[in-house]
Amino acid sequence: MAEQKKEKWGIVHIYSSYNNTIIHATDITGAETIARVSGGRVTRNQRDEGSPYAAMQAAFKLAEVLKERGIENIHIKVRAPGGSGQKNPGPGAQAAIRALARAGLRIGRIEDVTPVPHDGTTPKKRFKK
């Protein structure tokens, strides 16, 4: 009888704004950090931290670390600044997801976890009556 290997799963949290992209890998419970890479670690210019290219390079670095740890399957949680800020993820989110898939990691589910205000503070630069 062939033995079945237990698949190791991880969670990849992608925080993407227009200024930076932070990719953070944890175990399946979310309690233990495996690796954390940001756009600022892979580029020299501050203006390029939020670019799709920097996000792609960061994702490839993270995928390398995950494979060393034996994690082949991941769930992805995408987050934008949210709250009273931008509700849409920055340009690096899609590039990072594509790079993780290209690196050979199997993606289970992709989830949007952007915080949504339930009538919280007034957004800045909003018209007041």
Swiss-Prot record:
The keyword Heme appears for this protein: no
Molecular-function GO term, any one: rRNA binding
Keywords: Ribonucleoprotein, Ribosomal protein, RNA-binding, rRNA-binding
Key word rRNA-binding present: yes
Pfam families: Ribosomal_S11
Gene Ontology process terms (BP): translation
Biological role: Located on the platform of the 30S subunit.
Complex and partners: Part of the 30S ribosomal subunit.
Annotated protein name in UniProt: Small ribosomal subunit protein uS11
Organism lineage string: Archaea, Methanobacteriati, Methanobacteriota, Methanomada group, Methanococci
